[in-house]
């Protein structure tokens, strides 16, 4: 037997017999330290032992035979040394797992690691330095072990979830050094479908996912919370940290899992603030990733469209009952903008366009657009020549008729700060028209459906400047271009509206068309580009 393996055997004997002589621990720590340094600095030695099953079996034997939970009556010095020696074994395993993760997985060392750490909590303080160092080392070992594939053993899920729950028990100030290895391993785990299925049903999932990761790590250690809350803009100049990137990848994986749907529904019904924070986070994730496969797109659209459809019905009832309630409108508006923004981003994929059409999403979009058209006021702020200070406001109804300064204007606009309230659902019409434009592009069938569903006229009506929906004029004109292209029925429909002065000549010109009167007096549109 090699000298190195004898070191491991001696450590096994010491830990299993639970000897309380401090000098024995110091002697073994010195020998183990040399072995650890060699595996860290010498690739050949590391590769040799990482592929050796006997070495891994010795490590497993040490871990299985250790009884850290039985040393509570010992002196603080020996408890410290026992945990330190145990940590040294995990450091060695961490180094070897870089090249030998397959053998470690075969031996199910992750299950043993969870159990050992959970048992170690029975001895000493939660926040002592060695306890935290042991946790961080085990996390790094588990991450290295999961580099090629992730193993999730359902029979050890209770031990695993208890292991993951450890940082929640600490004062947050003590968790700083474990955050990165914790997030790395957590990201590894959620790549396993079964883990995420059971984790999202774990009774303490909120304390980990929302309390620790979303509320503490994301708020205090990441820029993501600032981006989600709107105090920081995503731009090429923003350098995302390692923690930022891990968090985004983590929630990208969560967003595409089937178990996320019932979890979101539960948060909407029981913890609305958490629900909105999650939804805003998913909005950030989805709108900043350009590569999704069809399965992932279907998963995202399933929960997005479900929330949108339910919320659209609630918005219709809100206006039907003339509620004018700022608290209710704030919730409805947030869900509406987020889901529409996600759909607008994902509409670049043909798969998502087909999804929306197959679920009669076009009907729902046009119906909601008409509700907004009938109930929202159009807002135009008067600004200084520098376009910075707002000096006044003009509000009109859907017909362009100026509204007097009555209670409706005060319900929809904060006249003191000159800001539009959520009660006027800002940016919702804009996003709907953007989605319709993408669905309509070079699709004759959808062009016709938009007309038949009553969408063509209302889109024409939005080819105007409206501060409630910035750039809605430009988006509407683009949508009209797509609706009229090579579509005689739509062109005749718009020509008829123009004859009644419902359509605007300037709008048609910007869309690339003009009214043509034939010799027999019939109106039609012709392209100005011909």
Curated annotation (Swiss-Prot):
Keywords linked to the UniProt accession: Cell cycle, Cell division, Cytoplasm
Cell location: Cytoplasm
Chief localization: cytoplasm
GO biological process per UniProt: cell division
Domain of life: Eukaryota
Entry GO terms, CC: cytosol
InterPro entries membership: ARM-like, ARM-type_fold, Ataxin-10/CTR86_families, Ataxin-10_domain
Cross-referenced Pfam families: Atx10homo_assoc
SUPFAM superfamilies reported for this sequence: ARM repeat (SSF48371)
Reported function: May play a role in the regulation of cytokinesis.
Family, similarity comment: Belongs to the ataxin-10 family.
Protein name, per record: Ataxin-10 homolog
Lineage, opening ranks: Eukaryota, Fungi, Dikarya, Ascomycota, Saccharomycotina
Primary gene name: CTR86
């Amino acid at each position: 037997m090699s000298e190195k393996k004898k070191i491991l055997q001696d450590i096994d004997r010491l830990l299993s017999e639970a000897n309380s002589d401090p000098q024995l621990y110091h002697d073994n720590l010195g020998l183990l330290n040399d072995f650890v340094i060699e595996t860290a600095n010498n690739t050949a030695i590391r590769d040799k032992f990482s592929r050796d099953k006997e070495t891994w079996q010795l490590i497993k034997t040490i871990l299985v035979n250790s009884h850290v939970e039985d040393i509570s009556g010992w002196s603080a010095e020996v408890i410290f040394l026992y945990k330190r020696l145990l940590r040294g074994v995990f450091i060695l395993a961490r180094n070897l797992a870089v090249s030998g993760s397959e053998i470690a997985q075969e031996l199910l060392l992750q299950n043993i690691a969870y159990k050992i750490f959970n048992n170690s909590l029975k001895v000493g303080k939660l926040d002592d330095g060695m306890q935290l160092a042991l946790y961080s080392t085990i996390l790094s070992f588990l991450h290295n072990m999961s580099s090629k594939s992730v193993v999730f053993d359902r029979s050890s899920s209770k031990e695993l979830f208890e292991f993951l729950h450890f940082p929640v028990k600490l004062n947050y100030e003590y968790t700083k050094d474990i955050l990165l290895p914790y997030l790395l391993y957590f990201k590894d785990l959620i790549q396993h479908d079964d883990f995420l299925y059971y984790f999202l049903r774990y009774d303490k999932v909120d304390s980990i996912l929302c309390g620790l990761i979303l509320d503490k790590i994301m708020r205090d250690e990441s820029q993501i919370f600032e981006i989600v809350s709107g105090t920081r803009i995503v731009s090429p100049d923003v350098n995302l940290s390692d923690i930022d990137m891990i968090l985004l990848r983590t929630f990208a994986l969560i967003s595409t899992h089937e178990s996320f749907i019932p979890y979101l529904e539960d948060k909407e019904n029981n913890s609305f603030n958490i629900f909105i924070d999650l939804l805003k986070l998913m909005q950030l994730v989805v709108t900043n990733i350009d590569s999704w496969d069809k399965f992932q797109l279907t998963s995202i659209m399933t929960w997005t469209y479900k929330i949108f459809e339910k919320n659209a019905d609630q918005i219709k009832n809100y206006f039907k009952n003339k509620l004018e309630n700022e608290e209710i409108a704030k919730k409805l508006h947030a869900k509406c903008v987020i889901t529409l923004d996600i759909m607008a981003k994902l509409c670049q994929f043909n798969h998502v366009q087909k999804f929306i059409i197959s679920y009669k999403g076009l009907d729902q979009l046009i119906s909601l657009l008409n509700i907004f058209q009938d109930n929202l006021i159009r807002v135009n702020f008067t600004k200084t020549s520098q376009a910075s200070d707002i000096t006044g406001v003009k509000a009109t109804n859907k017909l362009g008729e100026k509204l007097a300064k009555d209670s409706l204007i005060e319900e929809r606009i904060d006249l003191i700060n000159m800001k539009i309230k959520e009660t006027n659902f800002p940016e919702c019409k804009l996003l709907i028209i953007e989605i319709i434009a993408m669905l309509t592009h070079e699709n004759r069938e959808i062009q016709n459906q938009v007309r038949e569903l009553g969408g063509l006229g209302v889109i024409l009506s939005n080819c105007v400047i409206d501060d409630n929906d910035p750039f809605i004029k430009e988006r509407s004109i683009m949508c009209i271009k797509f609706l009229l292209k090579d579509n005689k029925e739509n062109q005749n429909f718009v020509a008829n509206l123009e004859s009644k002065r419902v359509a605007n000549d300037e709008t048609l010109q910007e869309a690339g068309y003009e009214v043509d009167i034939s010799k027999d007096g019939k109106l039609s549109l012709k392209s100005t580009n011909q």
